[in-house]
């Protein structure tokens, strides 16, 4: 049986820490930035760690060998 492919969308959007947590970039930066304060824009920079349930769902449903 051939190897399963990883979903390309997940490969591009998420990274994983050594302990298995899922890292994603902050959402809400594409448009409507004029109505946000400078502090809100500043806080949206960088990445965030997803909550455990979201990370579990990413690994279980979108990665072929994510959850053993």
Swiss-Prot record:
Gene3D superfamilies reported for this sequence: 4.10.410.60
Gene Ontology MF terms in the entry: structural constituent of ribosome
The UniProt record lists the keyword Ribonucleoprotein: yes
Alphabetically ordered keywords of this record: Ribonucleoprotein, Ribosomal protein
Domain of life: Bacteria
Gene Ontology cellular component list: cytosolic large ribosomal subunit
Gene Ontology biological process terms, A to Z: translation
Pfam families associated with the record: Ribosomal_L35p
Family, similarity comment: Belongs to the bacterial ribosomal protein bL35 family.
PANTHER family to which the protein is assigned, alphabetical: 54S RIBOSOMAL PROTEIN BL35M, LARGE RIBOSOMAL SUBUNIT PROTEIN BL35M
Protein name as catalogued: Large ribosomal subunit protein bL35
